[in-house]
Design a protein with these regions (language model features):
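Short flexible/disordered coil segments
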Residues: 67-79, 218-231, 314-317, 326-346
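Surface-exposed, flexible loop/turn segments at secondary-structure boundaries
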Residues: 165-167, 209, 279, 307
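Active-site gating loop/helix substructures
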Residues: 103-138, 170-259
Length: 355
């Protein structure tokens, strides 16, 4: 009997919209509404400073887009806001800092108004994400299990997720489907991915249940829970990264995870991008490179805008190895369209394989 064929999923924010979660643009809108409501409270000077900082960051993002010839009215997402805030917070550690004669007076002014304003702003984002990305009831996330229906005889499923939420993990646990995610006894240990036949989950941008502790290192609070989690879980922000440049820092676990993605696509027969908008240049470069290196690799785009996404990316546009399913994730998964397309493409690659 032939070994199961390697099939890779790339999960974007659109995967979880059907479960009731907001995408990154809507999360940015929620952040503004939250800060505006807090700033309207009597004597809440901190909230007013954070709201002004939010407006300053939004203005900077749009100004930069205009300078680059891009549409400054394009929607800003939560990752772009968080990235800007974190870069400003740690601006004095930037290698280019010695060459900057002066930072914007507005940054200095806002920091004078509220000590640690940028740190507090980042903390607010992390705290709100935990609330806004909370896992819905089990019936709303059951459709996510359809991604792993072929795992076993037909395929070996690996899921690379760009999402911070815990919907996928909870869905698999509810369905009693074992998986590995790089943690053993609550501590980061990527060796668990090796030689394991379970479903594999790689969270490229981090996870709401990951933290970094000075004593225990990189730990998980839920899947699976570190035995000492109660000692540090309250005061630790989740271990997340925002934006492409963060992935280029070489920091673990993110270096290991993105390397695993690049390596996986060397041998994968099918890559299914579900709810991914192809807005991450670094991830796109990896996919483009592997489409050149791994000729049997087929790519399936699952999105209501799948055709538009294909046409707007030159390395996808004219490729006969790229197919589109113009559906939301829930319909495409529950109605069997994704499963059928994977099986069709696996059969196609078998017929093309040399004897």
């Amino acid at each position: 009997m032939a070994d199961p064929s390697p099939v890779t999923f790339l999960a974007g924010a659109g995967l979880c919209v059907d479960a009731g979660l907001d995408d990154s643009v809507r999360l940015a809108g929620k952040l503004m509404q939250y800060l505006q409501a807090k700033a309207a409270e009597p004597k809440n000077e901190e909230a007013r400073t954070l709201l002004n900082l939010h407006y300053f960051i939004l203005g900077g993002i749009r100004f930069q887009w205009g300078r680059q010839g891009a549409n400054p009215d394009h929607p800003v997402n939560i990752e772009q806001i968080a990235t800007a805030a974190l870069r400003l917070r740690f601006r004095h550690e930037d290698p280019l800092a010695p060459y900057v004669s002066a930072w914007s007076e507005r940054i200095v002014d806002l920091e004078d108004q509220q000590d640690g304003a940028l740190e507090r702003f980042s903390d607010v984002i992390f705290a709100r994400l935990k609330e806004w990305l909370a896992t819905p009831p089990s019936q709303q996330i059951e459709y996510l299990n359809r991604m792993t229906d072929l795992h076993g005889k037909e395929a070996c499923i690996s899921i690379f997720s760009l999402n911070y939420d815990l919907l996928l993990e909870n869905a698999l646990v509810n369905a009693h489907r074992p998986f590995v995610n790089g943690f053993r006894d609550g501590r980061w240990n990527p060796e668990v991915f090796s030689g394991n036949s379970d479903i594999r989950i790689y969270k490229l941008h981090g996870s709401l249940d990951w933290v970094e502790d000075e004593m225990y290192g990189i730990c998980s609070l839920t899947f699976d829970r570190h035995p000492k989690a109660e000692d540090f879980e309250v005061q630790k922000p989740p271990l997340l990264i925002f934006g492409t440049n963060s992935k280029l820092t070489g920091r673990d676990p993110f270096l290991t995870l993105v390397h695993a993605f690049a390596q996986q696509l060397r041998s994968a027969k099918v890559l299914v991008a579900v709810g991914y908008s192809f807005s991450d240049k670094y991830i796109n470069e990896i996919i483009e490179q592997r489409m050149r290196d791994n000729l049997p690799l087929r790519l399936v785009l699952v999105s209501p805008d799948a055709d538009k996404i294909k046409q707007s990316n030159p390395f996808l546009e004219n490729s006969p190895r790229v197919t589109t399913l113009n559906h939301w994730a829930l319909d495409a998964l529950n109605k069997g369209a994704v499963r059928s397309e994977i099986l069709r493409l696996l059969e196609e690659t078998k017929q093309e394989a040399p004897f």
